[in-house]
């Protein structure tokens, strides 16, 4: 079988264009993992976030590893009212966490 591969996790904050349109979506990209099962948890300042989360099913990449994405939909007020947001990805018992912090300037 294929060797186990830990995921690469990238977390993107909302774009300034999106915030100007009164929306805020955080995107957590999870790529190059095997086997194709991951658990994604979102946190605001360390507290679990359940609402507004949408995670895609892992899909197989051309290199036979898997990729998935998770989206967290917020209002700009929610985004600005927290110090940090984290995307926590658990794969085969190991956890990768990426954090973004809202900047004051826009």
UniProtKB/Swiss-Prot annotation:
One of its GO terms (biological process) is adaptive immune response. One of its GO terms (cellular component) is extracellular region. Its main location: secreted. Disulfide bonds join 28-87. CDD domains: IgC1_L (cd07699). InterPro entries: Ig-like_dom (IPR007110), Ig-like_dom_sf (IPR036179), Ig-like_fold (IPR013783), Ig/MHC_CS (IPR003006), Ig_C1-set (IPR003597), MHC/Immunoglobulin (IPR050160). It holds the Pfam family C1-set. Immunoglobulins are composed of two identical heavy chains and two identical light chains; disulfide-linked. This is Immunoglobulin lambda constant 1. It comes from Homo sapiens (Human). The gene is IGLC1.
């Amino acid at each position: 079988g294929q060797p186990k591969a830990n995921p690469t996790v990238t977390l993107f904050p909302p774009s300034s264009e999106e915030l100007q349109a009164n929306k805020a979506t955080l995107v957590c990209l999870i790529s190059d993992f095997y086997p194709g099962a991951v658990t994604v948890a979102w946190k605001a300042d360390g507290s679990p976030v359940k609402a507004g989360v949408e995670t895609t099913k892992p899909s197989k990449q051309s290199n036979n590893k898997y990729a998935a994405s998770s989206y967290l939909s917020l209002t700009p007020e929610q985004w600005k009212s927290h110090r940090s947001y984290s995307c926590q990805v658990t794969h085969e018992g190991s956890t990768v966490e990426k954090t973004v912090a809202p900047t004051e300037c826009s």
